[in-house]
């Protein structure tokens, strides 16, 4: 057990984990983990574990009705983002996240919620009935092709077990008709302290919290007369088991081989022996994944991707999984290729060079983990406690793990690793295959699969060979430049350099993480500078470049050259900018700069990588139209650009217009002049460090530049003006009406005030729709609502509402969408809604100030278009009033541009 965690168990069986942590400061995580889930339902309760989770937010002993949500939103803790829960097959976990701790009463209220979630749910008849509609709409929203396939696959992979019978969301007939007592029976039978753990991690006093937990749960009795929670598992196969599921809306095929194993006995769970075994299994999976990645880069490969992992299949049962995503029509071939690679691993294992690379990666990742042990987020630490309670995962602490890895990893021999790899493959796997229902898909029959498995040991396979890897990224370094000027920008807290070649460099050093440097280089132009006929190639250019390697390395060679380094660099071409983003550890900072240098100076043309990429994209798109949501999203895209000729839908026709020549030409043009870019660095990087200065002057200052500068071209791709409606129907498996409503104005100037008023309008309407559409009408699982302002190519304000519902309810819900908008225009927002959203925005802002990613975004916005969040955000939020919200929304709606896109089921 991590010595930083206070761990204990009360006489009634309640487990608790308490940890002081200040990431972020004055915030805390409160979780209650229940070791119960859908697996414990009886047939007449199918879906009620999940239903019960919903009811926890609909009244408890100390918080009537929506009292939990109302109180915590008043202190900036948002429903959905910070107040939430999930139910799975074997567990249910509730949480209050990022709870402020500056007032003792808030902490006490959070613990009281944990108490009520433990043993004091109200479960009132009228609240149960009101929630039935919400659950049905969640069922509708989640019943996608992948979910339907998963449910059927569970039944075929684990026949005769509880895992075959329970899918969490449950049976709609049960949801509609269950008697109240059925829900209460499940609750009283399984919710008890002996099945529960309280997890509190954050800026709190551990002794005080422990005393409060003991006092709150002192009189909560252990469950009586229900016995211990039964542990259901799945069966071993006495012969290979084949499960095949197809779906009309599936967008691709997937093949999985599952090799089941008994979990280690309880005496070994959480021990050093188990930890060591997990490390070795992880090394095996990493090496096999590396092989799969290399194979997938061959344009002749039968699959677009493959991978493996080792994990829990069910309680008491682990499994090793090999997975492949076949190219359409080559499913049988892909299965055989997957089997071939698994047998190759089983027979010959791996080479020393393969092992050395993954050991280096493991050591460096653990070093970073150790270095950042004091800057880990509360939520991350809380989740470790949940996994310890629910699954028995070891939790020894960063100090122990780092010392153990340093001592043991060098002693892990190739023989040991290969013995573990060999043991992962046995003759009786489960083979699970899913795919679309259409001509041209070549899903192998059960007979073919069984025959291939039987012949596995007769495959002609050669042992892998050792290889030498070139690790020198740049063969000839450029001529070093100089720092031409340097100044400190007080209003944004950044150091600004201009290099001798004209490149602008911005630094904001932080200590939020102990070993992280973030980079972002950006320039105006992007796709707006590209000719219409080149747009298909331009939209895929950065992806093609990334798959092609860089300099004298192809993608596989580059991955091997970077083994053990904690570095990532990616070029992007967006609508109005071109960018390179990156991250690295402190010691790999120069490697990040070298990769950036190569992406500017030596992008690599690789015909084979291009063919592989196009084949992968075509495979993704082969069944795109099977999903009715594709037509829905395409319709929205066309409406947003007034059917401009520059609107490129992501489909097979678009890919046919892509050429490698044009992709390379566009990329080189977009990144032709580094002096047109601003480079932002945030994190553990000190501009006063001579080593940093030398590296920047060499790898940025050494690039060739010009005096040319580019801007953004306005192609007048505006929303279709006026009031527009596009209602249409499509065949679909789950009867659903999908709806998008969007208000747009081009008359509102871009200011911080307008930007934040638009944001808070979206937040307030989200609350209104939660109450009216979800809770009162039971009409939708949720309405996604988003208010925004865009700067380029010209200022634009927008308000988006999107939701799914029963087609029979669509007309009424659409009325409510517009009614809520008009109510705010007429009467202004409710004072409580406005205050809680302002509180939430300021709370989020305070937390964001301690994140490197946020500062990188702040500096991007400041140097791209002059918005200063550090100086202006807080006063702008404080200045928001009911009148400013009312006026902003009225101005938006008065522009007269609103469209509705609605897709109904065809029948």
Q: Where do the model's predicted regions map?
A:
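Proteolytic maturation boundary segments
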Residues: 1-18, 205-279, 284-293, 297, ...
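M16 family metallopeptidases and their MPP-like homologs
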Residues: 19, 24-41, 48-49, 66-116, ...
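Active-site His/Glu-centered metal-binding helix of metallohydrolases
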Residues: 48-56, 284, 541
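Metal-associated gating/positioning segment near the N- to mid-region
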Residues: 55-63, 67
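Peptidyl-prolyl cis-trans isomerase
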Residues: 71, 120-123, 127-128, 412-416, ...
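Hydrophobic, small-residue-rich alpha-helical packing segments that form membrane-like cores
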Residues: 127-182, 186-194, 199-201, 206-213, ...
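Flexible, low-complexity linker/tail segments at the boundary of structured domains
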Residues: 191, 671-672
């Amino acid at each position: 057990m991590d010595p930083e965690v206070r761990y204990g168990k009360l006489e009634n069986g309640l487990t608790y984990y308490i940890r002081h942590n200040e990431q972020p400061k004055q915030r805390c995580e409160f979780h209650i983990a229940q070791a119960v889930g859908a697996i414990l339902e009886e047939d007449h309760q199918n879906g009620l574990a999940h239903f019960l989770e919903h009811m926890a937010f609909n009244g408890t002993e100390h918080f009537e009705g929506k009292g939990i949500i109302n109180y915590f939103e008043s202190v900036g803790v948002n429903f959905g983002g910070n107040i939430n829960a999930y139910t799975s097959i074997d567990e249910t976990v509730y949480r209050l996240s990022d709870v402020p701790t500056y007032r003792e009463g808030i902490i006490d209220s959070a613990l009281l919620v944990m108490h009520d979630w433990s043993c004091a749910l109200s479960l009132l008849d009228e609240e149960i009935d009101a929630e039935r509609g919400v659950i049905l709409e969640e069922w509708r929203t989640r019943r996608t092709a992948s979910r339907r396939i998963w449910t059927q696959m569970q039944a075929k992979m684990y026949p005769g077990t509880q895992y075959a019978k329970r899918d969490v969301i449950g049976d709609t007939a049960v949801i509609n008709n269950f008697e109240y007592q059925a829900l209460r029976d499940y609750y009283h039978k399984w919710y008890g302290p002996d099945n529960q753990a309280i997890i509190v991690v954050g800026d709190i006093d551990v002794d005080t919290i422990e005393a409060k937990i003991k006092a709150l749960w002192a009189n909560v009795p252990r469950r009586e007369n229900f016995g211990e929670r039964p542990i259901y598992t799945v069966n071993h196969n006495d012969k290979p088991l084949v499960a095949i599921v197809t779906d009309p809306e599936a967008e691709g095929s997937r093949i999985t081989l599952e090799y089941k194993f008994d979990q280690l006995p309880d005496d070994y769970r959480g021990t050093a022996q188990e930890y060591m075994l997990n490390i070795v299994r992880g090394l095996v999976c990493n090496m096999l994944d590396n092989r799969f990645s290399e194979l997938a880069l061959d344009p002749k490969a039968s699959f677009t991707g493959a991978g493996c992992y080792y994990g829990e299949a069910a309680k008491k049962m682990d499994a090793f999984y090999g997975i492949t995503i076949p190219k359409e029509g080559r499913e049988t071939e892909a299965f055989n290729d997957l089997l071939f690679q698994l047998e190759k691993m089983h027979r010959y294992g791996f080479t020393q060079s393969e092992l050395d690379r993954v050991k280096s990666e493991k050591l460096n990742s653990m070093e970073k983990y150790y270095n950042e042990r004091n800057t880990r987020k509360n939520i991350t630490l809380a989740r470790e406690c949940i996994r310890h309670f629910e699954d028995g995962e070891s939790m020894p602490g960063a100090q122990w793990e780092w010392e153990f890895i340093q001592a043991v990893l060098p002693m892990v021999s190739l023989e040991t690793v290969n013995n573990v790899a060999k043991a992962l493959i046995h003759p009786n796997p489960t083979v699970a295959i899913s795919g679309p229902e259409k001509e041209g898909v070549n899903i192998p029959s059960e007979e073919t699969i069984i025959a291939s498995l039987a012949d596995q040991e007769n495959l002609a396979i050669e042992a892998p060979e050792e290889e030498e890897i070139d690790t020198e990224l740049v063969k000839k370094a450029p001529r070093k430049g100089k720092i031409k000027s340097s100044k400190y920008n007080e209003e944004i807290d950044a150091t600004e350099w201009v290099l001798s070649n004209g490149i602008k460099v911005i630094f904001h050093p932080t200590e939020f993480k102990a070993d992280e440097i973030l980079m972002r280089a950006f320039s105006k132009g992007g796709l707006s500078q590209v000719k219409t006929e080149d747009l298909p190639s331009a939209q895929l250019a950065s992806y093609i470049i990334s798959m092609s390697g860089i300099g004298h390395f192809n993608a596989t060679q580059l991955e091997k050259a970077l083994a053990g380094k904690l570095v990532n660099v990616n070029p992007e071409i967006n609508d109005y900018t071109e960018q390179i983003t990156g991250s690295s550890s402190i010691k790999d900072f120069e490697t990040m700069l070298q990769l950036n240098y190569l992406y500017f100076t030596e992008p690599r043309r690789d015909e084979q990588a291009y063919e592989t990429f196009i084949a992968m994209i075509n495979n993704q798109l082969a069944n795109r139209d099977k999903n009715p949501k594709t037509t829905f999203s395409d319709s929205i895209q066309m409406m947003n650009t007034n059917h401009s000729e520059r609107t490129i839908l992501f489909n097979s026709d678009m890919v046919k217009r892509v050429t490698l020549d044009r992709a390379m030409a566009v990329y080189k043009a977009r990144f032709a002049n580094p002096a047109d870019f601003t480079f932002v660095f945030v994190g553990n990087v000190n501009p006063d460090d001579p080593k940093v200065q030398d590296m920047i002057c060499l790898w940025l200052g050494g690039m060739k530049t010009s005096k040319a500068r580019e801007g953004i071209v306005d192609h007048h791709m505006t929303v279709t003006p006026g009031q527009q409606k596009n209602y249409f129907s499509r065949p679909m498996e789950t009867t659903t009406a999908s709806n998008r409503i969007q208000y747009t104005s081009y008359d509102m100037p871009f200011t911080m005030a307008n930007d934040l008023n638009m944001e808070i309008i979206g937040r307030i309407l989200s609350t209104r729709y939660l109450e009216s559409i979800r809770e009162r009408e039971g009409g939708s699982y949720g309405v996604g609502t988003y208010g925004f302002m865009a700067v380029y190519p010209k200022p634009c304000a927008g308000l988006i509402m999107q939701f799914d519902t029963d087609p029979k309810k669509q007309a009424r819900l659409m009325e409510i969408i517009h009614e809520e908008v008009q109510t705010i225009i007429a009467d202004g927002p409710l004072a409580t809604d406005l205050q809680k959203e302002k509180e939430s925005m300021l709370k989020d802002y305070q937390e964001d100030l301690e994140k490197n990613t946020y500062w990188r975004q702040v500096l991007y916005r400041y140097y791209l278009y002059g918005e200063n969040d550090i100086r202006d955000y807080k006063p702008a939020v404080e200045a928001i009033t009911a009148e400013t919200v009312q006026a902003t929304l009225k101005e938006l709606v008065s522009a007269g541009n609103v469209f509705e896109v609605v897709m109904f089921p065809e029948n």
